Amino acid sequence: MTYMKEYYTKIIEALNTISEKEDKEIASAAKSMATAVMNGNSIYLFGASHAGIIAEDAFYRAGGFALFNPIFSPSLMLNVEPVTQTSKLERLEGYGDILLDSKPVKKGDILFIHSVSGRNAVAIDMALTAKERGMGVICLTNLEYSKQVTSRHSSGYRLFELSDTVIDNGGEPGDAVVSIDLLTQKVAPISTIVGSYTIHSIVLKMIEIFEEAGTDIPIFRSANIDGGDDYNSQLFEKYKDQIHYM
């Protein structure tokens, strides 16, 4: 089997696993989010470094849910130089509190955190503070990986230990999945692919709930299709109290 074919096989296995074994957790996450939205609350997404790609993928996206509010920090994104700064800052205790304080979060809101290892301080801080403020916390993490490592937060918690709903991405420790004879480390991570599938699956489950409740479904249209800009502008206006990125 070629390396590329092995990677493809690992991806399909991971997607099948999360679809079959994490369906209840995905449904639980969707129910929490949909309920929050119908109650007038807000949903926030966070991830540091590559984990933050999932928030970017779900946010302001054609065919995507309009009420996802990302929590971005330039110092935790991959366009910062030196890029190693992201690793240092996601381990800095107290930084997650600052980031959450930058948003108008309130009781009943939902915070979705993507962290593969679930060990770093920024995600732990954010989860702890969210819980203190009465928010629901949902995490997407690698349980096998996270259970093998210690927390980098003074509380000793890992992310899955603080979350109301835990979705396991089914990955391997270290995220990469393809073994190479000449290398000591594996190659080709899968968390981004699995994460994208997961967040959009949550949206699809939410839509089923909205359909059953008979409520409107705030989904973006492509801005590159005629009429898309006008339609999206109407969403911004209608849901301005739940949209915090404009």
Curated annotation (Swiss-Prot):
Sample GO molecular function, one term: carbohydrate derivative binding
Family matches, as CDD domains: SIS_RpiR
Pfam families, sorted: SIS_2
GO biological process: carbohydrate derivative metabolic process
Organism superkingdom: Bacteria
Gene3D superfamilies: Glucose-6-phosphate isomerase like protein, domain 1
Positions of the SIS domain: 33-212
Record-linked InterPro entries: RpiR-like_SIS, SIS_dom, SIS_dom_sf, SIS_GmhA/DiaA_subfam, UPF0309
Family the entry assigns: Belongs to the UPF0309 family.
Protein name, as recorded: UPF0309 protein OB3413
Annotated organism of origin: Oceanobacillus iheyensis (strain DSM 14371 / CIP 107618 / JCM 11309 / KCTC 3954 / HTE831)
